[in-house]
């Protein structure tokens, strides 16, 4: 469940960023203003869950040529399991087509100019972000008034959100190049184009998403070489370890502080403002280090020893086929497209760390506002601020709020959102008319009536090769048991903050996502067998049951005889 502050912030951010992107593509200001309804509704909040309003994403694609192809590419990138066709390509008259030519030319010129200069733009974006990031003195936020904190938030809106177009344009580039490479593979008759394409994308160096994991592995090596420190790490609770280490090993304590300073905002659920990060609680960092210590063979040297092998095998399969069937010139074009896709994915993953840190800055600002509102008796506790919307915080500061008794508003919201935690919603559904009026949000099935709990085989999309036979560990939050020790990590979705858990997993299976989602990219970088897009995965599989997963075919076979007894117990309980 996502809190009102996170949703209202994300919704405003999407509007701001995509509005600037339309302007960058040369769309006339009058047209941008005419599409405010679309821009304000890129996201939806249903029973506390954030959804894409996919029709408005389709409408955004209408600003680009080749709607059908771009629609298909976007669906593949997002991992949509049931695309819809409520938004169709526009059938224009000759006069309308002529009138639209200048806009199309501006969009194409702007887009492809940026595609050609993407590395330079990414470098400039990262420099810009680093300057703004360092301008915020996080350790001094407590010295600012509520008004000054609101002004700082608005300043970041102007300096960051209104200059976030490079990541969006690069996402378009990823979408288009991924579709283009996929069509190349289909053209030469590759039997499993998704699998081969995943292997072609593996072994990519310079992906910053894996740097936190690699730094933790170096820290783990330091612990292994210091037996007294290792004994302390293994014998103390995660919540007190930072204080224990401070008095025991100054050098390692500094390593911990450096990690928190660099990657303290990178945590599970990092795109929720209400998430507790390493800056507030370092427990997750030590849980990961203990996981690493439990696997004596886990080092940087052994982390991804098979990556180059799978990539080379895929290249040895594809390159001769392309040349034999399409010629040497086509092979050159294919190599160029593949290289562009690899670069675009690397750039996307590296810019995502900037997104993580941006959320961290806003999180600290709003948390301090909560501290002060609590101090002045306007909220019962500081974290109640996450049950206000961004506009309500701004309006309270500006003197235009329609409800100034904040705590009664928070109490009603907390009760409502607590009830949402027990709601089980599908990953997509249709609505008709007013969204919150008479819509059941039960598409494509109602409840669990069509979920086959007895299924012996499940199928998703393979992301990285390997056959693993092991117990599964269902993990949904940092509060769950995180000790994997070779077990298969199963969850609904992941974000970049999950990456440190991956090296100790025997395999990774994610209910939602695509071959371009973060879990797939990092699994390829770390060389871990992975499957994504498995419908109802976490409803069907039971924690600790034994399965066999195939990262090539995307198949999952249930092996544990205990499954039958677990199912019997569930049936008797119901």
Where are the regions a protein language model picked out?
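Residue-level recognition of conserved structural "scaffold" positions that shape functional pockets
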Residues: 55, 384, 437-440, 467-469, ...
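A residue-level detector for conformationally permissive "hinge/kink" positions
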Residues: 346, 369, 425, 452-458, ...
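Acidic, glycine-rich flexible loop/linker segments
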Residues: 1, 472-488, 492-574
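Mature hydrolase/peptidase catalytic cores and their serpin-fold inhibitory cores, especially
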Residues: 424-486, 490-500, 508
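Surface-exposed loop/turn and secondary-structure junction residues enriched for glycine/proline
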Residues: 348, 361, 381-382, 388-399, ...
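Contiguous hydrophobic, helix-prone segments at protein termini
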Residues: 4-457
């Amino acid at each position: 469940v996502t809190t009102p502050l996170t949703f209202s912030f994300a919704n405003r951010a999407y509007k701001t960023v995509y509005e600037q992107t339309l302007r960058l593509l040369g769309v006339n200001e009058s047209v941008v203003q005419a599409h405010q309804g679309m821009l304000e509704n890129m996201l939806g909040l249903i029973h506390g869950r954030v959804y894409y309003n996919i029709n408005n994403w389709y409408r955004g694609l209408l600003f680009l040529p080749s709607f059908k192809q771009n629609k298909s590419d976007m669906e593949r990138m997002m991992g949509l399991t049931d695309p819809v066709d409520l938004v169709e390509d526009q059938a224009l008259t000759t006069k309308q087509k002529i009138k639209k030519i200048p806009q199309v030319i501006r969009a194409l010129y702007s887009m492809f100019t940026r595609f050609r200069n993407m590395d330079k733009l990414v470098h400039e974006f990262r420099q810009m972000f680093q300057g703004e990031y360092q301008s915020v003195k996080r350790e001094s936020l407590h010295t600012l008034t509520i008004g000054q904190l609101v002004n700082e938030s608005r300043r970041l809106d102007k300096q960051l959100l209104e200059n976030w177009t490079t990541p969006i344009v690069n996402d378009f580039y990823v979408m288009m190049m991924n579709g283009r490479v996929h069509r190349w593979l289909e053209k030469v008759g590759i039997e499993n184009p998704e699998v081969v394409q995943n292997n072609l994308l593996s072994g990519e160096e310079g992906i910053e998403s894996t740097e936190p994991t690699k730094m933790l592995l170096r820290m783990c090596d330091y612990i292994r070489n210091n037996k007294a420190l290792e004994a302390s790490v293994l014998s103390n609770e995660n919540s007190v370890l930072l204080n224990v280490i401070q008095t025991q090993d100054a050098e390692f304590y500094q390593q911990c502080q450096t990690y928190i300073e660099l990657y303290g905002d990178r945590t599970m659920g990092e795109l929720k403002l209400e998430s507790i990060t390493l800056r507030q609680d370092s427990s997750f960092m030590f849980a990961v280090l203990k996981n690493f210590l439990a696997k004596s063979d886990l080092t940087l040297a052994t982390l991804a020893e098979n990556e180059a092998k799978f990539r080379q095998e895929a290249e040895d399969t594809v390159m001769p086929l392309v040349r034999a069937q399409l010629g040497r010139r086509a092979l050159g074009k294919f190599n160029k497209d593949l290289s562009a896709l690899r670069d675009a994915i690397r750039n996307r993953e590296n810019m995502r760390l900037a997104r993580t840190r941006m959320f961290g800055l806003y999180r600290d600002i709003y948390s301090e506002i909560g501290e002060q509102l609590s101090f002045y008796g306007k909220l019962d506790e500081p974290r109640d601020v996450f049950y206000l919307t961004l506009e309500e915080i701004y309006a309270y500061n500006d003197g235009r709020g329609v409800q100034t008794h904040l705590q009664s508003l928070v109490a009603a919201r907390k009760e409502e959102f607590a009830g949402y935690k027990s709601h089980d919603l599908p990953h997509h559904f249709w609505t008709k008319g007013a969204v919150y009026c008479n819509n059941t949000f039960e598409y494509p099935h109602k409840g669990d009536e069509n979920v086959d709990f007895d299924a012996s085989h499940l199928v998703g999309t393979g992301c990285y090769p390997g056959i693993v036979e092991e117990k599964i560990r269902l993990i949904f939050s940092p509060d769950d048991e995180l000790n994997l020790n070779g077990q298969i990590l199963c969850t609904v979705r992941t974000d970049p903050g999950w990456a440190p858990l991956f090296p100790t997993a025997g395999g990774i299976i994610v209910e939602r996502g695509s071959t371009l989602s973060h879990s797939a990219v990092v699994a390829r970088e770390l060389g871990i067998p992975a499957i994504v897009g498995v419908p109802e995965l976490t409803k069907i599989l039971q924690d600790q049951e034994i399965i066999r997963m195939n990262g090539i075919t995307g198949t999952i076979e249930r092996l544990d005889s205990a499954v039958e007894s677990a199912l019997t117990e569930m049936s008797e309980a119901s």
